[in-house]
Curated annotation (Swiss-Prot):
Modification Valine amide, positions: V14
Any GO molecular function: toxin activity
Species per Swiss-Prot/TrEMBL record: Polistes dorsalis (Paper wasp)
Subcellular localization: Secreted; Target cell membrane
UniProt-recorded name of the protein: Mastoparan PDD-A
Annotated tissue distribution: Expressed by the venom gland.
UniProt keyword terms in alphabetical order: Amidation, Antibiotic, Antimicrobial, G-protein coupled receptor impairing toxin, Immunity, Innate immunity, Membrane, Secreted, Target cell membrane, Target membrane, Toxin
Function: Antimicrobial peptide. Has activity against both Gram-positive and Gram-negative bacteria (B.subtilis (MIC=11.8 uM), E.coli (MIC=7.5 uM)). Shows mast cell degranulation activity (EC(50)=15-26 uM). Has no hemolytic activity (IC(50)>100 uM). Its mast cell degranulation activity may be related to the activation of G-protein coupled receptors in mast cells as well as interaction with other proteins located in cell endosomal membranes in the mast cells.
Family label: Belongs to the MCD family. Mastoparan subfamily.
Top-level taxon: Eukaryota
Length: 14
């Protein structure tokens, strides 16, 4: 699991 990818997705959601 890529934490950085999840973080990027969350940043895009915000």
């Amino acid at each position: 699991i890529n934490w950085k990818k999840i973080f990027e997705k969350v940043k895009n959601l915000v």
